[in-house]
């Protein structure tokens, strides 16, 4: 039948069964669990709860609704993250506002001002961390992840994902698929994972580090960065690119088998890993022939012969 279920105070379990059921939830009702697999079902929130008060997160196969003004109140919707037959279809608020399950699922992908942990679904999702030090997990599908402010961790998961670290010292992991990673400002760590990944860098992006040992990978520099702005330096097995006063990209183990295969500019010019290797060899020979050692990046910039080496290997 069409039942009305009121758990009241305490941590309750409510199961409406078949029919169009209504669940009543008021502030202070505790941590309740709802399981409902039939009909068109509704949660009605009492006075004091509006759309702006709720926080939604995925919890495995479930959806958890919590409340910004309470540390103890919550509603766990069993299987609502994985099986549409268990969906609660309608959410009604005392002030007349309404939401559907898709609204709830969308809200679960948006962070708060706190440190959030957000999980995507088996679809093409967009996750937004907002403020705080957030952790975003895209899961399946071709996802877009925005870290926002704070020191965030972004995991693309399966699919061709796009990861934006934005502000802060972020860590971006593409995992499977042909991913695009852009750390943004701050000193970021970027790891594309398997397949063919692209790393995007622009002015004032800070001191970033890349590790990638799979696929055919590319670094792309944004508008305003030309070949004359970029210097190369080998440090042990790493390759360090300097392209601004405080802007660098360190490619871990570039000369030990974990290489970036190509560096490209917005102009369409590019240089391959083999050409970079040749430049490094020529630079070492030049330094030896001229009695130079421990050449700094600034020394390179001020030496026209060295800069000619750096710019000569680029093609269109």
Which residues make up each language-model segment?
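Acidic, glycine-rich calcium-binding repeat modules characteristic of RTX/beta-roll
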Residues: 1-62, 71-87, 115-119, 124-238, ...
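Low-complexity acidic/polar repeat-biased segments
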Residues: 66-108, 242-316
């Amino acid at each position: 039948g069409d039942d009305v279920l009121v758990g009241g105070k305490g941590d309750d379990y409510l199961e409406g069964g078949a029919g169009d059921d209504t669940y009543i939830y008021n502030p202070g009702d505790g941590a309740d669990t709802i399981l409902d697999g039939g009909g068109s079902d509704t949660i009605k929130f009492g006075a004091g709860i509006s759309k702006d008060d709720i926080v939604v997160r995925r919890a495995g196969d479930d959806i958890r609704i919590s409340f910004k003004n309470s540390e103890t109140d919550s509603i766990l919707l069993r299987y609502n993250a994985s099986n549409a037959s268990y969906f609660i279809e309608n959410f009604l608020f005392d002030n007349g506002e309404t939401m559907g399950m898709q609204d709830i699922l969308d809200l679960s992908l948006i962070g708060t001002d706190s440190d959030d942990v957000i999980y995507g679904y088996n679809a093409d999702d967009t996750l937004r961390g907002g403020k705080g030090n957030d952790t975003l997990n895209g899961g399946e599908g071709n996802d877009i992840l925005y870290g926002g402010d704070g020191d965030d961790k972004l995991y693309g998961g399966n699919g061709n994902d796009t990861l934006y670290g934005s502000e802060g010292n972020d860590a971006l992991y593409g995992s499977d698929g042909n991913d695009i990673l852009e750390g943004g400002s701050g000193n970021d760590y970027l790891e594309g994972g398997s397949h063919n990944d692209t790393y995007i860098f622009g002015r004032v992006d800070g001191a970033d580090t890349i590790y990638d040992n799979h696929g055919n990978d590319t670094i792309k520099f944004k508008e305003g960065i030309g070949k004359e702005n970029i210097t190369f330096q080998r440090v042990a097995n790493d390759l360090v690119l300097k392209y601004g006063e405080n802007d660098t990209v360190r490619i871990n183990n570039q000369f030990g088998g974990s290489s970036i295969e190509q560096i490209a500019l917005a102009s369409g010019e590019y240089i391959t890993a083999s050409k970079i290797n040749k430049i490094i060899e020529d630079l070492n020979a030049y330094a030896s022939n001229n009695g130079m050692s421990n050449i700094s990046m600034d020394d390179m910039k001020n030496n026209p012969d060295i800069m000619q080496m750096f710019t000569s290997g680029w093609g269109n």
